[in-house]
């Protein structure tokens, strides 16, 4: 039996009825996802080439999250070329067994400095960072209760769910309800952990971060913030809204991405040294996987360093976002009132 015949044999053994039912339901409800086959060309951002089923055409990519075009910036590409020539393509292992290159160490130091934290920890994506940090917090604090904003990202929701910890969901940005939940947790001898985002991806509004920190201080709660739509874009050095508001030292754990504004790939958390040490010791999603490519680390580090010193890039991005919203409004296309950011 050759390889193709063997594969067909095993495929026949699968009961396709549940699969076909799922796919039909997704298509009938309009929730079936279709990939856009595009090719971004360096130097032409945000233009791209779209490969359709019947034709190929030039497009303007309005849905990219490469907010600042750093994915095509010369300083990033040059850094990646240098690393590729020096180290080759991959890391060669997990972080604990040969997969910690000097590029990983240097990038984690750069991230720690960006967020004014003692340590940081790289993950293969910000989704994985969220998921496995939250799972790890449950292992470290058995009596933890997660207090989650109702508009949190799927990675936060899944991380809490997979941790099997108790959770309470508070209405979006509702500080009265959050304080009530914190008080109840303390009365129940639990460790409250407030999980929220700085910039919410679906409607572009921001959280009342200072008020959340005040509540956390009052009830000795852990604070966990997702800054993936803010790092690189806000703050004097691109440290996100926590830097912009001077709250970096009041947030226990900051999650960020090396995609989006930094234009590369990967995710991280930044926190106290002991917190990072504990999480790296128990997070299976960190331990048992090949680490990021040193090439990606080099590109991300170059992007972070560049954006630390180039506020004009952030200013231009904000000006363009403001102009777009004004033109949409002028043409009777509704912009959500709560969308006070670039989203």
Please describe what each predicted stretch is.
Residues 77-125:
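Conserved N-terminal alpha-helix of the aminotransferase class I/II PLP-enzyme fold
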Residues 7, 14-15, 21-87, 221:
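N-terminal "arm"/small-domain region of PLP-dependent enzymes with the aminotransferase-like
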Residues 66, 168, 172-225:
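Active-site phosphate-binding strand-loop segment of PLP-dependent enzymes
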Residues 237, 243-278, 292:
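Active-site PLP attachment segment
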Residues 125, 147-163:
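Substrate-binding/gating loop at the entrance of the active-site cleft, primarily
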Residues 316-322, 329-343:
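Conserved PLP-binding catalytic core of the aspartate aminotransferase-like
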Residues 295-315, 326-330:
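Amphipathic alpha-helix from the class-I
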Residues 134-154, 175:
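Conserved PLP-anchoring active-site segment centered on the Schiff-base-forming lysine
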């Amino acid at each position: 039996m050759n390889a193709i015949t063997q594969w067909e044999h095993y495929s026949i053994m699968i009961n396709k009825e549940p699969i076909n039912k799922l796919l039909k339901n997704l298509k009938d409800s309009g929730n079936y996802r279709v990939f856009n086959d595009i090719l971004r060309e360096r130097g032409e951002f945000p233009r791209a080439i779209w490969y359709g089923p019947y034709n190929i055409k030039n497009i303007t990519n309005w849905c990219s999250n490469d907010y600042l075009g750093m994915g095509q910036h010369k300083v990033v590409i040059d850094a990646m070329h240098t690393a590729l020539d020096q180290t080759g393509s991959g890391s060669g292992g997990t972080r604990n067994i040969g997969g910690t290159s000097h590029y990983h160490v240097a990038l984690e130091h750069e991230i720690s400095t960006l967020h004014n934290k003692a340590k940081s920890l790289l993950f293969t994506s910000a989704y994985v960072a969220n998921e496995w940090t939250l799972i790890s917090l449950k292992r470290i604090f058995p009596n933890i209760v997660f207090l989650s904003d109702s508009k949190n990202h799927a990675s936060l929701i899944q991380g809490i769910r997979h941790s099997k910890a108790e959770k309470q969901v508070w209405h979006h940005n509702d500080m009265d309800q959050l304080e009530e939940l914190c008080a109840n947790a303390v009365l129940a001898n639990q460790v409250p952990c407030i999980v929220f985002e700085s910039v919410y991806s679906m409607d572009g509004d921001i959280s009342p971060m200072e008020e959340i920190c005040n509540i956390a201080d009052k009830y000795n709660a852990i604070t966990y913030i997702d800054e993936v739509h803010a790092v690189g874009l806000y703050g004097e050095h691109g440290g996100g809204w926590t830097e912009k508001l001077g709250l970096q030292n009041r947030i226990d754990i900051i999650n960020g991405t090396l995609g989006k504004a930094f234009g590369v790939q990967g995710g991280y958390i930044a926190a106290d040294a002991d917190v990072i040490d504990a999480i790296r010791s128990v997070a299976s999603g960190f331990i048992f996987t090949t680490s990021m490519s040193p090439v990606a680390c080099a590109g991300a580090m170059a992007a972070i360093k560049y954006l630390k010193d180039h506020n004009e890039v952030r200013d231009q991005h904000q000006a363009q976002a403001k102009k777009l919203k004004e033109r949409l409004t002028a043409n009777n296309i509704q912009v959500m009132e709560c969308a006070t950011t670039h989203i």
